[in-house]
Design a protein with these regions (language model features):
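C-terminal helical cap(s) of enzyme catalytic domains, especially alpha/beta-barrels
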Residues: 73-84, 216, 263-287
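Histidine/acidic-residue-rich catalytic or RNA/ligand-binding cores of hydrolases
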Residues: 209-212, 239-247, 269-274
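Active-site beta->alpha loop and helix N-cap motifs at the rims of alpha/beta catalytic domains
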Residues: 1-14, 36-152, 165-183, 190-191, ...
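Short beta-alpha connecting loops at secondary-structure transitions
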Residues: 231, 261-263
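Surface-exposed amphipathic alpha-helices with a cationic face
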Residues: 16-28, 54, 82-94, 100-102, ...
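Catalytic cores of alpha/beta
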Residues: 47-51, 176-189, 235-255
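A beta-strand-loop signature enriched in Asp, Gly, Thr, and Trp
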Residues: 200-216
């Protein structure tokens, strides 16, 4: 199996979930994932944010606010198969966020209601598979009310009905006050079938230390899963020095995939920050 950073477009798009997972592992912490909002006009108008992200060094693209019941990616020409067309244009694995809402959880802020096509359910997992997504991310946007317990339940459903790579975890509170890096929850996610565990990047949420993330990464690796650090706190719009520091610190912790979020301009990180992240963890040759 070739490293993802050595693969051609055709090789990337022909991988099954196990091959993609192994290819990421073989990169030894040199994989960049960019999250983009696909439901608003993109930064460059007639070019999708995903295409722009890939041109600045992204290996994987995660679509946020994607509605499986009304599949639309702004910036694409009209098509009945937007995910397949996007994959053809960028030549990279593409996934989407689906949110396991916990209606019984105590919220620490007003709950933000989302459409049914964004919920993590049997129906959306089936549609995500039909649309051609390579992976799904079970997480929560701000204020939607996603808990560790609801994520674990959703993993079991996704394992049965989706079939691709499953990413699971929280970038931030999502409106619920609970530990964001919790080994018991991580173990539950992996046992339920998660392939990649998402955690906040060190320096993005208050109080999360390198030691905690390093311990979690070692635990995740021992269980045969991959780790992903997320910049999901609008710091994707910070200066390049901040991004570089986050990138190196989280690579030192043992992270396999470094994610950069969508809260820069027009539903994506500042393009320069995607490149800064990529260069920091693998140099210009691989960017």
């Amino acid at each position: 199996m070739k490293r993802l950073l050595n693969c051609t477009t055709s090789e990337m798009l022909s991988m099954n979930k196990d091959e993609l997972k192994q290819s990421i592992l073989a990169c030894e912490g040199r994989t960049v994932m960019t999250e983009t909002v696909c439901a608003i006009p993109p930064l460059l108008g007639d070019l999708t944010n995903a295409e722009l992200a890939v041109s600045f060094g992204s290996d994987m693209v995660l679509l946020n606010v994607f509605d499986c019941n009304h599949p639309t990616i702004m910036g694409l020409p009209e098509t009945e198969q937007p995910v397949q067309l996007l994959k053809k244009l960028i030549g990279r694995p593409v996934g989407c966020n689906l949110e396991p809402i916990d209606n019984d959880a105590t919220m620490m802020e007003d709950r933000y209601e989302i459409s049914s096509g964004r919920h993590a359910t049997k129906e959306t997992f089936i549609k995500a598979k039909e649309l051609g997504f390579d992976f799904i991310c079970l997480t929560g946007n701000p204020g939607t009310g996603v808990s560790h317990a609801s994520i674990e339940k959703a993993i079991l459903l996704a394992k049965e009905y989706f079939g691709g790579l499953i990413i699971a975890g929280k970038m931030h509170s999502s409106g619920i006050d609970e530990a964001l890096v919790d080994l018991k929850s991580i173990e539950g996610f992996i046992e339920a079938g998660a392939d990649i565990i998402l955690m906040p990047a060190v320096n993005t949420v208050p109080g999360l230390t390198e030691k905690e993330l390093h311990t979690a990464c070692q635990f995740i690796k021992s269980k045969g899963a991959l780790s992903l650090s997320a910049i999901g706190t609008s710091q994707e719009g910070s200066d390049e020095a901040t991004i570089r520091e986050i990138a190196l610190m989280n690579k030192r912790c043992g992270i396999d995939i470094q994610h950069i979020g969508d809260a820069g301009w027009c539903g994506m990180a500042l393009p320069e920050n995607i490149m800064t992240l990529s260069i920091a963890i693998r140099g210009k040759r691989r960017t």
